[in-house]
Curated annotation (Swiss-Prot):
Keywords: Coiled coil, Membrane, Transmembrane, Transmembrane helix. The keyword Coiled coil applies. Pfam families: TMCCDC2. This is Transmembrane and coiled-coil domain-containing protein 2. One of its GO terms (cellular component) is membrane. It is found in: Membrane.
Length: 182
């Protein structure tokens, strides 16, 4: 059983891509958390596979969501960014929870490190405000373009009959009806 266990470990190590993932997190996000070594038996072997599944599902959901939002309209860039940030946060929470579970399998005192949550929320809020101002400017430009278009004049007939739906009368009227005219 030792040979199948070592093959399983090789496959898990190959699929986990943990060194690439750690490098990307360290360079792009500034995260340098080093995973703690544990000796949990089967759970220790299962951890990289679960992280690979989380990563693949994150990428699939990100791709499907971005494609769906992109097909709706170009104005949904704000929604695409919000979707991507939210999906990444969900992935990060799941990954952090699983890491905390590996460290403490009993489940007591599971504390997740959210030291950058306020920073990321503030940055997200600033991005959303900027996108809203850009969206408002685009709407203003659309209004200006519409107002600059030449208005087409309707051709009126030489008849002076009332054409409103209330009084479709062939008689020329002033728009008011009184009992003395009848």
């Amino acid at each position: 059983m030792s040979s199948s266990s070592s093959i399983w470990d090789i496959i898990i190590d190959y699929l986990s891509l943990s060194s690439i993932w750690n490098y990307l997190q360290a360079t792009l996000l500034g995260e340098t958390s080093v995973p703690q070594q544990t000796n949990l038996g089967p759970l220790d072997n299962l951890a990289p596979a679960v992280q690979v599944i989380l990563g693949i599902s994150f990428l699939i959901l990100l791709g499907v969501g971005m494609y769906a939002l992109w097909k709706r309209s170009v104005q949904s860039i704000q929604k695409i960014l919000l979707f991507a940030i939210t999906l990444y946060k969900l992935y990060k929470k799941g990954s952090d929870f699983f890491q905390a579970l590996l460290v403490n399998p009993e489940g007591s005192d599971l504390t997740l490190q959210d030291n950058n949550i306020f920073l990321s929320l503030g940055l997200q809020e600033k991005i959303l405000k900027k996108l809203q101002t850009v969206e408002n400017k685009v709407k203003d430009l659309e209004g200006m373009i519409i107002s600059q278009k030449p208005t087409t004049k309707r051709e009126y007939s030489s008849d002076h009959y009332c054409s409103c739906s209330d009084c479709q009368s062939p008689l020329p009227t002033s728009g008011f009806t009184s009992t003395s005219e009848m």
